[in-house]
A protein has these predicted regions:
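Acidic, metal/ion-coordinating pockets
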Residues: 1-123
Length: 123
């Protein structure tokens, strides 16, 4: 009996959650929220990210500049302490990630904040 395996792969999302280009505020076919809404969770699909994930958008740049107190004020109780990109990737069902060079831009502490909140296995 033949089975089908589908691989969904992202790379270089650079912290974009929303399908919006902030320069002109137009919807685009981009962003983790747009992509994740299309992922099947059927047991036959692997969802993988190739890195350069946590740096580059206005959201991730702001997140890295917030103090722990400011993060607590912005996040609800059920998401407090969860890196926003990790939270979205967890909801999307990512199973595996690798790291890209830009994932190191904010330093080791920021990278570990992301990885420790991520359900996916970092290869």
């Amino acid at each position: 009996m033949a089975k089908t395996l589908t691989i969904r792969y992202t790379s270089d999302t650079h912290g974009y959650l929303y399908p919006t280009n902030y320069a002109d505020m137009q919807d685009r076919p981009m962003g983790l929220m747009k992509l994740a809404s299309e992922y099947p969770h059927d047991g036959n699909t692997l969802i993988i990210d190739g890195g350069d994930t946590i740096q580059g958008s206005p959201l991730t740049n702001l997140y890295q500049r917030l103090s722990p107190e400011e993060k607590a004020a912005c996040l609800s109780e059920d998401t407090y302490g969860t890196h926003p990109i990790a939270a979205m990737m967890n909801l999307a069902g990512y199973q595996f990630v690798t790291l890209g060079n830009h994932d190191f831009n904010y330093g080791v502490d920021a990278l570990m904040d992301y990885l420790t909140n991520l359900d996916a296995l970092c290869l």
